[in-house]
Curated annotation (Swiss-Prot):
Its main location: secreted. GO terms for cellular component: extracellular region. Residues 172-255 form the Expansin-like CBD domain. Gene3D superfamilies: Expansin, cellulose-binding-like domain, RlpA-like domain. It comes from the Eukaryota. Glycans are attached at N115, N159. Induction: By gibberellin (GA3). This is Expansin-like A3. It comes from Oryza sativa subsp. japonica. The lineage of its organism: Eukaryota, Viridiplantae, Streptophyta, Embryophyta, Tracheophyta. Belongs to the expansin family. Expansin-like A subfamily.
Length: 276
């Protein structure tokens, strides 16, 4: 069973303040609809050649697509140096002749370097933007004017999970990647401890969903994380063993916790539009 605490320690408040000061003000109003550009990328794939994509999900991106939405690559403003990895967006294009009103849900799993295009979309996502029979016309356009907003991720029956990265080496060198982070929140801090111990040790963010520690405790491990967004935050952890003592690189472990929170925002009223 997952345990959620809303009591914020003084150390967490310092972390939150530091995070807020380094985050662009606009990110606090993520429920607002924004205008941008999206382009078609025939090469965008759940299994990008030569690696795991700009977020490093690799083959797990295919699972995220099946459970969360179509795959998308985000530009610098969306990717945010990896902090945007795994975020979910609702998007529709603005050409009334060929674009559907409902649009599509996408999951950010890759990065592209252009500042002129906010998103690159693969074939399925691009086709989903179009009215029936109009996808071929959309693909002929260089870039589409789109409306988009961040929305809560919903991975259906998936709990927050941990992928032990291949570069990990037992017992002390541990690198993990979070998968299936639901809701509309960000992970700000991660601690690890041996099951039954109160000796929590902090992990360091490598980028986006990847965290590491070179002095991981021995034995079966438990985790806790500060999940925050806007001005709201809480500790989240599973009150059970997450990684066994003989954890293996390349394996995925279920934390048993599920995040469904939508962090409150301090921004002023903004356009939300009707997305029916």
């Amino acid at each position: 069973m997952a345990v959620l605490l809303s009591i914020l320690s003084s150390s967490f408040l310092l972390l939150l303040a530091a995070s807020s000061s380094s985050t662009p003000r606009a990110s606090a109003c993520e429920r607002c609809v924004r205008n941008g550009k999206a382009a078609y990328s025939p090469s965008l794939s759940p299994l990008p050649p030569g690696g795991g994509g700009g977020c490093g999900y690799g083959a797990m991106a295919m699972e995220m697509e099946l459970n969360g939405g179509f795959l998308a690559a985000g530009g610098p403003r969306q990717h945010r140096g990896g902090l945007g990895c795994g975020r979910c967006f609702q998007m529709r294009c603005r050409n009334a002749e060929v674009c559907s009103n409902a649009g599509v849900r996408v999951v950010l799993t890759d990065f592209h370097r252009s500042n002129s295009t906010d998103f690159l979309l693969g074939g399925p996502a691009f086709a989903g933007l179009a009215k029936p029979g109009m996808a071929h016309k959309l693909k002929k356009l260089d870039a589409l004017s789109v409306e988009y907003r961040r929305i809560p991720c919903d991975y259906k029956d998936k709990n927050l999970s941990i992928l032990v990265e291949e570069q990990s080496k037992r017992p002390n060198n541990l690198v993990i990647k979070f998968l299936y982070q639901g809701g509309q929140t960000d992970i700000l801090a991660v601690d690890v401890a041996q099951v039954g111990s109160s000796d929590w040790r902090f992990m360091t963010r490598v980028y986006g969903p990847v965290w590491s520690i070179d002095r991981a405790p021995n034995g079966p491990l438990q985790f806790r994380a500060v999940v925050t967004g806007g001005y709201d935050g809480k500790w989240v952890w599973a009150d059970r063993e997450v990684l066994p003592a003989n954890w293996q690189p390349g394996q995925v472990y279920d934390t048993g916790a599920r995040i469904a929170d939508v962090a409150r925002e301090s921004c002023l009223d903004c356009a939300t539009l009707d997305w029916k």
